Amino acid sequence: FIKIGQIMSNRYDLLPKEYCDALANLRANVTPMDFKEVNQILKDELGNINEIFQNISQTCIGSASIAQVHRATLKSGEEVVIKVQRKNIYEIMSTDIKLFKRAIRLLHLNLLIKIVDLNSVLDEIYNVAKEEMNFEIEAQNLEEFRQNNYDIVYIDVPKVYKNLVTKKVLVMEYVNGINVTDKQTLLNSGYDLEELGLKLSNNYIKQALDDGFFHADPHPDNMCIRDGKIMFLDLGMMGRLNSRHKQLLKNAMNAIVKNDITELEHVLISISTTTGSINHTKLRNEIQKVLDKNVTEDIENINIIEFMSSVSKILRDHNIKLDKNITLLMRGICVIEGTLELISPNINLIMVFENKIKENTFNDIFSKGSLMNTSRNIISGVNSLSELPTELLSFVKDVNRGETKIDIEMANSDKQVDK
């Protein structure tokens, strides 16, 4: 149940902000498994563990809903941590999902059902949880993240011991760092908090806009500072953005800066699915009110968290469901913004976002082959739904769902048609 709640806390597109905030507090301190169970799992997964480890601490240093972590020392003398999956966690999660679905049928959840299709949400949650419960995927995530940030000297992730990874066991280097929100210890250790905050924000935006592969749960417990580097931990939940997503995000940012409601609405619908008809005039008016309230002439003063939660509510009210990865990014940005408020409140993530877009635009214009790419784009013409006018885009989506009827009236229909 805890893992389900944690995953749901990332879905601002599905649940009201107050629900997500409450669920985000579910940082599980679950009763750990007995070490005998842990030992047996390690033997089943890795074989003769006495040939691998000098010692394994019987006391876990972290116990969560799907796994627990123990310190250990390899035969080589290297200090590591072992992440061990809880016994029968797949079966437990499957049972929990079934119980939730049964509760939906038995209870009168009228308000919530109007907001979201709970059965579909639960299926989606289970798919996400299954990925998190496969530690081979997390090991792949760590390696991909490392490669993406290989040339950035201030970003790193724990080393993975690839020969000691299975679906149920993950062995990584032990990272002894300072929590990213422990201001006093960071200051005592000689860190510049403004510089640290700027590095964190720049890298997170890079993860999204350049790599298209970002940490989807970057709360402070999943980061620490070691030897001048920001260490990202627990990469079980990651988000992905394709080139279309990244371009639409840039378009959205430009629309916000220019206060272009029509373009912003167009982008939001382009990265969404609709579950009913849309009143475009009302939608634009409500988005305009949110912009007027949160975005002044000085965009540095924007309240990111309030702005994103308000937009999410408007979209839910208008039967619009944002792409899952976009909502993961929105949630991640809000979490990073909360961390910045604690350690370097003068840094504004929106300005970092805008500067990154300008940098990318400049690089795109002057990059090798950009003229050829531009020519190809002109020749190819309008080749995606994202380029259609907003009302036409919504109309096409309605037709695809079978929710639109087209009446055709033929003039002079009483006359016989010649073949």
Language-model-detected regions and their locations in the chain:
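Histidine-centered phosphotransfer motif of kinases
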Residues: 215
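Broad phosphate/nucleotide-binding scaffolds in NTP-utilizing and phosphate-metabolizing enzymes
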Residues: 1-207, 212, 220, 224-419
